[in-house]
Amino acid sequence: MSLSALLNQLVELTGNISNAYTIALYKVDADKETLVLRHHISLSLNFDIDAKVKFGEGPIGNVAKSKKLFLVENFEKNPTKICIYKKNENLKSFLAIPVISNDLEGVLIIDSKESYSFPAKQQKIITGLANQMAWQLNQEKQYSKKDTPPQS
């Protein structure tokens, strides 16, 4: 299995265990200080696959800048403010986790249409999976600088 396929599988597994409405892994574009979509699964037809998030902008960008988890258990604000949906999706819970290897590699976001969807135990499991994603993203970045493809 390639590193790319393994990373996609980690994102999908995390979405499954968290009962996500949407799960999305954004990777860092350090030159532009933005986050770009790497992989996602969403039940929404309004998910914006072209959205780019600037560091420090909205909850996702703030996680990239602060490198600290962001959790809202009763999220009722308009999700267009988080720049991942083209229109309001009436979300109830939102979790954004920094994906860090040695440096910030990306941000993992998970949302739900249910309130209080991310208890402490689940956050711990998701954080562990995010750590694996960080390693995978770092490997992809290293190998993209070389001509030889990564070995699994």
Q: Where do the language-model regions lie?
A:
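Allosteric cytosolic regulatory segments
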Residues: 127-135
